[in-house]
């Protein structure tokens, strides 16, 4: 493995605890857009939300709703519901996440937080958790062009943070989409974590190079001393 200079860390499920909050916001959003509980259409929509965890939220809603206006309305409702949960204190850091970001910074590794949330929601989470001093960059699909599983976010992190080669990137996430994004970007290390919804088998099938119990194991995977 080449020397890692940039770590691109996913948020919900990787550094931020997700105790069903994302799916709850999805459920509320599609309910506002007419998909009532107990209907086949709602069941299909929730299944889509589950299998696309980690991807750009607007792209997920475009899969659910054929009309662009409906997709945009659902996305706005999702962001509103999730932001309300954040404001009410319904967001917590996963154990060790802040310490890992601090340790990476001490080692000269720049930290980018990556997410499928809109920038406003992303920034509200970061500020709520007090992480601004720990990171160098935060990116959403709107900042990079396309969300996961495309490579745009890690490649944008590389460019904005002055990396010299894709092999300097470490991409860490809890979903197969995170892993695919990192692999497509050519990252030097693509690591899965087991703190989200994906199983070890699913992350292995996505070809994660390393599977960690949590992001707390990242410094060791990078060869950093305690």
Regions found by a protein language model. Give the residues of each.
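Asp-based, Mg2+/Mn2+-dependent phosphohydrolase catalytic module
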Residues: 1-5, 102, 118-119, 123-226
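N-terminal helical cap/lid subdomain that shapes the substrate entry/recognition surface
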Residues: 2-99
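Conserved G/P- and acidic residue-centered "switch" motifs that form tight phosphate/ATP-binding loops
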Residues: 14, 115, 174
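Hydrophobic residues in well-ordered beta-strands that form the structural core
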Residues: 17, 113-115, 192
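Residue-level marker of alpha-helix boundaries and capping positions
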Residues: 48, 91-92, 113, 169-170, ...
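Short, acidic loop-to-helix structural element flanking the phosphoryl-transfer center
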Residues: 84-113, 119-123, 151
């Amino acid at each position: 493995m080449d020397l890692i200079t940039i770590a691109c860390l996913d948020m919900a499920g990787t550094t931020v605890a997700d105790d069903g909050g994302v799916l709850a916001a999805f459920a509320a959003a599609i309910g506002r857009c007419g998909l009532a509980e107990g209907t086949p259409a709602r069941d299909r929509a929730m299944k889509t939300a589950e299998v696309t965890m980690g991807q750009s939220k607007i792209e997920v809603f475009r899969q659910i709703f054929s009309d662009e206006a409906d997709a945009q309305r659902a996305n706005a409702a999702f962001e509103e519901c999730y932001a309300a949960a954040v404001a009410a204190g319904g967001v917590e850091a996963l154990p060790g996440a802040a310490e890992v970001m601090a340790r990476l910074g001490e080692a000269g590794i720049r930290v980018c937080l990556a997410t499928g949330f809109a920038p406003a929601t992303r920034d509200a989470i970061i500020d709520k958790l007090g992480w601004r001093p720990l990171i160098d960059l935060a990116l959403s699909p709107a900042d990079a062009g396309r969300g996961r599983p495309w490579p745009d976010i890690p490649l944008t992190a590389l460019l904005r943070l002055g990396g010299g080669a894709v092999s300097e990137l470490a991409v860490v996430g809890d979903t197969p989409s995170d892993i695919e994004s990192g692999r497509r970007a050519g990252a030097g290390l693509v690591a899965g974590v087991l703190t989200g919804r994906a199983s070890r088998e699913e992350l292995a099938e996505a070809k994660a190079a390393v599977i960690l119990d949590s992001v707390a194991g990242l410094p060791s995977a990078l060869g950093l001393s305690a």
